[in-house]
Amino acid sequence: MFQVRVRVSNPSERSRYFDENFWVDTGALYSFIPEERLNEIGIRPLGTRELLLADGRRDRRSLGEAVLTIPQLDESLTCPVIFAPADSLYLLGATALENFGVQADPTTQQLKPIAAVIGGFLASAPQRLT
């Protein structure tokens, strides 16, 4: 794992934000952000998710949306985020990485662009007009 700088903004009020170093974690589906930091910028939960943690425990946590900006990519996108406990690491998960169209390169410790797969098998199947 390696870290990247991320700006986290409130989608409804982009002037409310903070910058933080996030661990790139391809094993985490969602990005994890300590809930007090999300609350500070006015992000509110939209629902909950059942999570399987790395140590095998299960937990139910709040889920919200935040605008994530990764300066090295020069792009901002709204991504789902988990309201994590106060002592949690900041994690940039697989959903955000896919949204940005990047993969983690552990050799260079950088995010690298990837081609998006659209529809997989169905998109490549021959089409019949009727």
Residue spans of the language-model regions?
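Pepsin/retropepsin-fold aspartyl endopeptidases
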Residues: 1-130
